[in-house]
């Protein structure tokens, strides 16, 4: 999660409060508040822009209690989204993954269940119309493999927003090796910088939305949208 060209940390806890650590100068400040802070039997934390409005959401996947979803607004303000029955109040959530599975530019959320009982997989996506309100950046290293650990920064007239490739992947969380950005209202003049794991940075100008851009360390190509 980052909306200021600086990476932040989201931490979920069973016995202590959930936290959002935002770096300010040389220290981190916890900006979590309200319902977000309440401890839960959390198994997975995922940050992604599920509805392509240009503001990321934080998904909290719990086991044996309802899942929660929060939108990150300006200045770190958190707005809880009512998931209703899709909160899976009796779900035995274990892991989750986020990816554009059907390649329509809208992210899907796959949730796995089990551990204390048999439950099926569930697959969700936002109920929004397909459009060109997204930009997807897929960095590849010199060998053509996903550039895990590379940091992509989108700059526009409204924001600087950094995402590190596969930063959220781990034991129970998985994400595709793509930086997915929804587009805000009135947003334009898009530029992208890619900082590779060797410390070097390449800069690119984005002329069209609704596409997936594939960056290589020496050049750039555009894949079909």
Residue ranges and their predicted role:
Residues 16-31, 66-81, 117-132:
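Beta-propeller blade repeat segments, especially FG-GAP/WD-type strand-to-loop junctions
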Residues 8-13, 57-62, 109-113, 192:
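Hydrophobic beta-strand segments that make up the repeating blades of beta-propeller
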Residues 38-39, 89:
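Conserved loop/turn at the beginning of each blade in beta-propeller domains
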Residues 4, 20-23, 47, 57-58, ...:
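Carboxylate-rich, polar loop motifs that coordinate divalent cations or form catalytic acidic clusters
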Residues 1-4, 42-52, 94-103, 123-125:
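Beta-propeller blade termini
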Residues 14-15, 63-64, 147, 186-187:
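Short proline/glycine-enriched turn/loop motifs at strand-loop junctions of beta-rich domains
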Residues 16, 41, 65, 92:
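Beta-rich catalytic cores
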Residues 77-225:
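Gly/Ser/Thr/Pro-enriched helix-cap/hinge segments flanking short amphipathic alpha-helices
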């Amino acid at each position: 999660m980052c909306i200021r060209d600086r990476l932040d940390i989201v931490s979920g806890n069973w016995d202590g409060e959930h936290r959002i650590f935002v770096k300010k100068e040389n220290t981190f400040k916890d900006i979590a508040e309200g319902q977000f802070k309440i401890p839960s039997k959390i198994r997975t934390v995922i940050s992604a822009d599920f509805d392509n409005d240009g503001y990321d959401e934080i998904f909290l996947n719990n086991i044996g209690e309802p899942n929660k979803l929060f939108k990150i607004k300006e200045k770190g303000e958190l707005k809880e989204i009512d998931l209703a029955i899709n909160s899976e109040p009796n779900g035995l959530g274990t892991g989750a993954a986020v990816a554009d599975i059907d390649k329509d530019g809208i992210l899907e959320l796959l949730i796995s269940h089990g551990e204390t009982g048999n439950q099926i997989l569930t697959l969700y996506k936002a109920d929004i119309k397909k459009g060109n309100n997204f930009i997807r950046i897929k960095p590849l290293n010199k060998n053509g493999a996903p550039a895990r650990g590379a940091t992509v920064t989108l700059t526009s007239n409204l924001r600087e927003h950094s995402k590190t490739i596969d930063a959220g992947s781990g034991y129970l969380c998985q994400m595709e090796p793509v930086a997915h950005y929804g587009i805000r209202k009135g947003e334009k003049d898009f530029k992208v910088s890619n900082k590779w794991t060797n410390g070097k940075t390449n800069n690119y100008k984005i002329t069209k939305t609704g596409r997936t851009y594939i960056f290589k360390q020496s050049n750039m190509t555009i894949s079909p949208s």
